[in-house]
A protein has these predicted regions:
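Surface-exposed, charged secondary-structure patches
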Residues: 59, 71-75, 112-128, 140-166, ...
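Core segments of small alpha/beta cavity-forming domains
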Residues: 81-154, 187-270, 343-386, 391-394, ...
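Beta-propeller fold detector
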Residues: 155-157, 328, 386-395, 450-459, ...
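A short hydrophobic beta-strand element
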Residues: 185, 283-297, 418-424, 566-571, ...
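Beta-propeller blade signature
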Residues: 435-449, 535-541, 583-598
């Protein structure tokens, strides 16, 4: 049966072959005289075959279009462009000028720490504001006035009287006379928009009729006007400048008071203002003022016109006859777009901008990413592409809201495929999170040209506070985890599960050490009154952690990271001591450099040499060293250095500053390979969205934190008030606590002041310490009578005793603070304890020549020469105890 089946199968095949042969034979015997006319069998055959292929090809092409349509229709659901800005803008008005511009929030914020400028009220507690509608319909305007810490309600109401045009509404507030002079209050303005959307605007207002505010505001606007007119400038503002050889006249990115008049008036640049400057008032009193102007200019270079953002800082005082300029700084930064004007062969001509800017490259150097003016750009020289990966502004979205600089972008990593992981943080100018503050993590896919949203973490703190913490630590790994430092805590966000957990809390930023690329960190995890017993080391790329413990009879101290390697030292307990300023000195007899695997790469020790600190600069460690003399006392020894030759990094794409004719110095990047200018693809990606939200809320609970501010910029976050004051003092700034109360302020103090309510007392007996009497005198001055001996014996410190008994106050312990800095409190009739053991005194007044002390032992008031007092303060470490107060 099998053979029969095989034969029949063969016969069938032979039959088919014969039929095919006959078919071709018929073609062979055709009369060729037809010459391929319509009736030609060859042509008919070929046409039949051709039509079959045409039909198949047509079906294939139609299928491609059909499936492409389906795919594109699906992508429309998955990706979208960033929606335009939709919130109105509010400015305070004075003498025809806009100042202290407010951008709207779509959620309520912790406004006690928002310092977007301070706003003086006009005479009679009046405030004029202008609401720029920006094309939005405003259904209602209301307001709420509270104490700066939000605890006390002052007044609220709806705004029903205003004048308006198609573009703006002018409002006027007159507040009740229950507000106190020279006291800050928080004003919240609420706009109700269409669909019952609410936008919140915050201002810090105060009443003080001694400021000459209108005159000072006119001064900065007039100064700015003059810089655009060379002839007028020489006569009108030349007298304010201090032009000398220290001024850099080769670079427009930073111009200062020492620059030449030609440089201040824009040199040979054809510059035009494209919008009106808006002023932010940072600090102001009867004499001093600190103000900032922000605006945009255009400049023509050859045939090309570019836009630039400009920020000017003015610090000046009002004299009896005129203003005196103490400092002037102008910063200029190119507003870039991903277009042909930037790329030329292997060069990126970035233009006038800071030379120190955020940038990164892939390992092979084919992909290069950089940040300019809060926008992220990605160049792929291999694929010949250049695009804006993320930006709130573009050529269709370029108003004040889109150019608001209150956010930053940081690049985390770039892989070999050119995909960029990055995050942006601060205030979101437009898009799905418009009007919110937080941290937004993304991945840019270079092949699909799509920005994928990973996670949005919302918080109620303003940009300046977020920036201060995130610049210490933020890192995303390949495990779908995002680590960041905020509010004295390290958090880990699980991207897939949209959850946040706390890794460590109550972590003073001075006890946190982070490597340059943010992938490693270490912190103090166990300590006692002597020093550090244990540190924890965390690899955020793998989420592994381990501890480093001190040996018996020793303590350890971290000095920082060199690359990804941690440097820490070992010290004997007997060698650790406090200096006169209360600073702990840890002389380390041995240094260790360990890698991420906890392997010791190097030890450093020399006989009778103790390392007390170091400076780390790239791959160079400079060691500060002491040695013991014949008496066993530590004395200074020559410094030493350690070089890590393996850490030197070379880039395949290199930035440099070059000189040009009109623009002077500009920033240029030389790419790994040359790009074809005729074939460059300029990309503008869309954002990939997901069903549901990729948003989590971060609950914050700041305590015992002080913020140093200058203008509206946060200079640092501190748990040590003395360091916060020193930072603010150097920058003509202010220190506030986490509730927004002033802890210290650089201002004009009265030349002399004495707290007259504090009078001489009886001398103390041997059972009473001078510190007890000083504290009791303060409490009596504040209207309370208390024996503090028990409190002190129970271990309470003086500041805590004052804070516990004086309402609406906070005790302050200041170490290594200058005598000038304590005048802030004395000027406000707040006494200051000068700590000196049994010789502690209470400072109650000052003048140019003397300080007034209450000597608690004798009970007498005494005038002490300034030099003598200075020596006393210095010998006791400039250690003071005082307190801050605020209205109930």
């Amino acid at each position: 049966m099998t053979k029969v089946a095989d034969l029949s199968h063969i016969r069938e095949l032979m039959k088919k072959r014969k039929e095919r042969a006959n078919e071709f034979n018929s073609i062979k015997h055709v009369d060729l005289q037809d010459n391929g006319t319509r009736n030609s069998p060859i042509k008919q055959f070929l046409l039949q075959k051709a039509w079959k292929y045409v039909i198949i090809a047509a079906w294939f092409v139609a299928s491609l279009f059909f499936f492409g349509y389906l795919l594109n229709r699906g992508n429309t659901d998955l990706t979208k462009e960033m929606s335009p800005a939709s919130l109105p803008v509010i400015c305070v008005r004075e003498n025809g000028h806009d100042f202290n511009r407010m951008f709207g929030y779509t959620t309520e914020m912790d406004y006690s720490v928002i310092r977007d400028g301070i706003t003086p009220l006009q005479t009679g507690r009046k405030l004029n504001v202008r609401v720029y509608k920006m094309g939005e319909k405003i259904n209602n305007i209301s307001y709420e006035l509270r104490s700066i810490d939000k605890e006390r309600f002052v007044e609220e109401g709806d705004v029903t009287t205003y004048t308006q045009t198609s573009e703006y509404m002018d409002l006027s507030f007159t507040f009740k006379d229950i507000i106190s002079e020279k006291t800050d209050y928080s004003l919240k303005i609420i706009l109700t928009l269409e669909n019952d959307r609410k936008a919140y605007y915050y201002a810090r207002i105060f009443e003080d009729d001694t400021l000459n505010f209108s005159e000072k505001l006119d001064y900065v606007y007039y100064f700015n006007d003059c810089t655009f007119d060379k002839e007028t400038a020489q006569d009108e503002i030349g007298k304010y400048m201090e032009s000398n050889s220290s001024g850099d006249n080769t670079n427009f990115s930073h111009v200062n008071i020492h620059s030449s008049m030609d440089q201040v008036t824009w040199g040979s640049l054809e510059v035009k203002r494209v919008d009106e400057p808006v002023c932010t008032v940072g600090e102001i009193d009867s004499k001093n003022a600190l103000m900032k102007l922000e605006y945009t200019v255009s400049a023509l270079t050859g045939e090309e016109e570019r836009l630039y953002s400009v920020t000017e800082y003015y610090r000046f005082i009002k004299g009896s006859d005129r203003m005196y300029l103490l400092s002037f700084d102008r910063y200029m930064n190119t507003i870039l777009y991903a277009d042909k004007g930037v790329v030329y062969k292997d060069k990126l001509m970035l233009g006038i901008m800071p030379s120190d800017f955020e940038h990164a490259e892939s390992k092979d150097g084919n992909t290069y990413a950089f940040v300019n003016n809060n926008a992220l750009f990605v160049v792929n020289s291999e694929q010949n592409t250049f695009g804006t990966a993320y930006s709130f502004y573009d050529k269709d979205n370029d108003d004040d809201r889109c150019l608001n600089p209150d956010h930053d972008i940081k690049i985390v990593s770039i892989d070999e495929s050119g995909n960029v992981i990055f995050y942006t943080y601060g205030y979101f100018n437009r898009g799905d999170y418009e009007g919110k503050c937080g941290i937004h993590l993304f991945e840019y896919n270079s092949k699909t040209n799509v920005v994928e949203e990973k996670l949005f973490i919302e918080c109620d703190k303003p940009y300046e506070i977020i920036k201060e913490d995130l610049e210490k630590l933020a890192y995303a790994n390949l495990l779908g985890e995002f680590y960041f430092y905020f509010d004295q805590k390290i958090y880990k966000a699980n991207i897939a599960e949209q959850q946040i957990e706390t890794i460590v809390e109550n972590l003073n930023n001075e006890n946190l050490y982070v490597c340059a690329n943010n992938s490693m960190c270490a912190w103090v995890s166990k300590e006692d009154s002597i020093g550090v017993l244990q540190m924890t080391f965390l690899r955020m790329d793998t989420s592994e952690r381990y501890t480093i413990d001190a040996k018996g009879g020793e303590r350890i101290k971290a000095l920082g990271f060199m690359g990804e390697d941690l440097i820490y030292g070992d010290a004997k307990i007997d060698d650790i001591y406090e200096n006169v300023y209360g600073e702990k000195i840890v002389p380390m007899y041995n240094l260790n450099i360990i890698n991420k695997f906890k392997e010791i790469l190097k030890k450093y020790s020399e006989e009778n040499i103790y390392v007390t600190g170091c400076r780390i600069n790239d791959n160079l460690i400079t060691l500060m060293r002491d040695t013991k003399d014949e008496n066993g006392s530590l004395v200074s020894a020559p410094p030493d250095s350690i070089v890590n030759s393996l850490m030197e990094k070379t880039y395949k794409n290199n930035s440099e500053v070059i000189a040009t004719e009109n623009l002077k110095k500009i920033v240029q990047v030389t790419l790994k390979r040359e790009m074809d200018n005729k074939k460059i693809k300029f990309k503008t990606p869309k954002t990939e969205m997901y069903e549901g939200k990729r948003e989590v809320l971060l609950n914050t609970d700041s305590e015992n934190i002080f913020y140093a501010y200058s203008l509206n910029e946060c200079l640092g976050e501190f748990t040590d008030l003395s360091k916060a004051i020193k930072t603010a003092d150097e920058n003509y700034g202010t220190v506030i606590d986490c509730d927004g109360h002033y802890a210290w302020k650089k201002e004009t103090y009265a030349s002399t002041n004495q707290i007259m309510k504090i009078v001489e007392t009886s001398e103390i007996n041997d059972d009473t310490s001078s510190l007890e009497r000083c504290i009791e005198t303060i409490l009596e001055y504040e209207g309370f009578s208390l024996d503090v001996k028990k409190n002190l014996s129970e271990g309470m410190n003086p500041g805590d005793i004052i804070e516990k008994n004086v309402p609406y106050s906070k005790g302050l312990d200041l170490k290594n603070s200058s005598s000038d800095e304590i005048k802030y409190y004395l000027n406000k009739d707040i006494p200051v304890i000068a700590m000196a053991g049994d010789n502690t005194v209470l400072v109650v007044g000052y003048s140019d020549k003397v300080y007034v002390w209450l000597n608690p032992r004798s009970g007498n008031l005494m005038k002490v020469n300034v030099d003598e007092a200075e020596t006393f303060y210095e010998n006791n470490g400039y250690h003071f105890v005082t307190y801050m107060k605020w209205d109930s």
